[in-house]
């Protein structure tokens, strides 16, 4: 099982449901601790696991952002494994699946195959198509042939993220554009 956090409601409070979170790009489960606490204090069992290539799944610098040999399909399977585990541990509670940013893309893919396993879905910060998406996919496939599937191209990063990073440049925080007040 991937590195994960489960936060239960305090004391004798009876759980009213499960909220499973799927985090975004360049994030990890510990960034959500305050969110888990907020909802667990309201009576929810809150759960989040690090996506491959993120958080405690990263053992070497080459692991950052690497989704494994199965890529997207493997991430969908990881979500299903964790959801199945949560439903087995807490069988009589409704499960709400929340995906943020890249996690929103993953949960949208997940419900195409497994909608019967969840009771509600929340999609937030979902990225939209941009004019470079298809070109980016082609460039990434070509680059994989020459430099392997773990190579992180600064060019591709600038092409895909540059427009979002520009307004936050003065903050001096890498990936500040991912989430702001």
Task: Give the ranges of each region predicted by the language model.
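Alpha/beta-hydrolase active-site loop
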Residues: 67-87
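Glycine-rich nucleophile elbow surrounding the catalytic serine of serine-hydrolase chemistry
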Residues: 99-109
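Alpha/beta-hydrolase-fold enzymes
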Residues: 109-181
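Active-site glycine-rich loops that stabilize anionic/oxyanionic intermediates
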Residues: 16, 21-27
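Conserved alpha/beta-hydrolase
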Residues: 29-31, 36-62
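Alpha/beta-hydrolase fold nucleophile elbow
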Residues: 90-101
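A short loop-to-beta-strand scaffold at the N-terminal edge of the catalytic core in hydrolase folds
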Residues: 1-10
């Amino acid at each position: 099982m991937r590195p994960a956090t489960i936060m239960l409601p305090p004391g004798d409070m009876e759980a009213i449901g499960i909220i499973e979170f799927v985090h975004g790009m360049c994030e990890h489960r510990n960034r959500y601790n305050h969110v888990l606490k907020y909802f667990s204090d309201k009576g929810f069992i809150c759960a989040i696991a690090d996506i491959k290539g993120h958080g405690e799944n990263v053992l070497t610098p080459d692991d950052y952002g690497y989704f494994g040999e199965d890529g997207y399909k493997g991430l969908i399977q990881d979500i299903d494994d964790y959801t199945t585990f949560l439903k087995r541990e807490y069988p009589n509670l409704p499960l709400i699946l929340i995906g943020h940013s890249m996690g929103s893309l993953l949960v949208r893919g997940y419900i195409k195959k497994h909608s019967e396993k969840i009771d509600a879905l929340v999609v937030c910060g979902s990225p939209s198509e941009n004019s470079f998406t298809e070109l980016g996919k082609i460039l990434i496939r070509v680059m994989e042939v020459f430099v392997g599937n773990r190579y992180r191209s600064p060019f591709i990063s600038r092409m895909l993220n540059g427009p979002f990073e520009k307004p936050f440049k003065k903050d001096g925080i890498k990936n500040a554009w991912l989430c702001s007040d």
